[in-house]
Regions:
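Intrinsically disordered, low-complexity regulatory segments
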Residues: 1-54, 61, 65, 82, ...
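Intrinsically disordered, low-complexity regions enriched in serine/threonine
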Residues: 1-16, 97-103, 109-279
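Amphipathic, interaction-prone secondary-structure segments
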Residues: 53-118, 268
Length: 279
């Protein structure tokens, strides 16, 4: 696996995020306060005249009319304040009828107006017991919409394309839950995750550390339990370990939109690949 990010980096080049999550649809006021870039009124000065500027709030309002509601939103903080209203932001949306539950499929909508991102939609999965927001791999499909032409209609079409793979996500989850992992396979999955996150030179924690569940529901021996445990430990951090110099540390939580998406997606692919190899 290739090295993804520096072991002790707080975030990617996009910096920390402002974020909000609720157990109900977010209000316009909450979005305005926490994620103002959704309401940006014009493209960044670095964008050309060919850039079709459609505020994310316009896209969101159209998605809401189609029955999709935001439950989580965040945007990256930037040092260059001129980009604050244009910076990358992410929404996690649920469809009417799939609002609550222990496991809820979601549409992940990414965008920015400073040239760092097109509209991007990915399938996701929310686990209520640990507030884990999973990102499913590219094998299940994702949609990119450039800032050109009829953006709103294409994003709405993309949302329905993502909804179309929700059943396949459920099927993958059921298959992972039914597959009992022998200890060597659990260790291999955890080692692949550590290598992706930290590289080969130094890993501040061990496979045993990231395979240690945070709640009794994850003490199963199946692939789904191992994947969930690794995902939560890697993203939430707080695990005691040692730096390359031997200093005692705690792993940091991931606050970067980019790193969250990349690591989350990679973990799904690892679990999915292991599932297929052991069937």
């Amino acid at each position: 696996m290739r090295r993804s990010v520096n072991a002790y980096q707080l975030a990617s080049r996009f910096g920390h995020v402002n974020q909000i999550r609720r157990e109900r649809p977010l209000t316009r006021e909450e979005l305005m306060y926490h994620v103002p870039s959704i309401f940006g009124e014009d493209r960044h000065t670095s964008r050309s005249e060919r850039y079709a500027y459609i505020p994310t709030i316009t896209v969101l309002e159209n998605l809401q009319r189609e029955g999709f509601q935001p439950f989580f939103a965040c945007q990256t903080r930037v040092r260059d304040q001129s980009r604050r209203g244009y910076t990358k932001h992410m929404l996690r949306l649920r469809r009417a009828g799939q609002i609550t539950g222990q496991h809820v499929p979601e549409i992940i909508l990414l965008n920015s107006h400073d040239g760092s991102s097109s509209y991007q939609m990915l399938p996701g999965y929310f686990r209520a017991i640990c507030t884990n927001g999973l990102v499913c791999g590219q094998s299940l499909g994702e949609v990119r919409v450039p800032h050109r032409g009829n953006v709103v209609d294409r994003v709405i079409e993309g949302a329905y394309e993502v909804v179309g793979v929700f059943d396949r996500i459920e099927e993958k989850r059921d298959a992972m839950q039914s597959l009992v992992l022998p200890p060597p396979a659990r260790q291999a999955l955890a080692q692949a995750a550590l290598t992706y996150r930290y590289g080969d030179e130094h890993q501040p924690v061990t496979t045993t550390d990231i395979l240690t569940p945070r709640r009794r529901e994850d003490y199963g021996k199946d692939l789904w339990s191992a994947y969930q445990t690794i995902q939560e430990n890697m993203l939430k951090g707080g695990i005691s370990g040692r730096s390359a110099r031997g200093k005692r540390i705690h792993t940091r939580a991931i606050h970067s939109i980019d790193t969250d998406i990349k690591l989350n997606r990679a973990l799904w692919v690892m679990a999915e690949t292991l599932l297929e190899s052991m069937r």
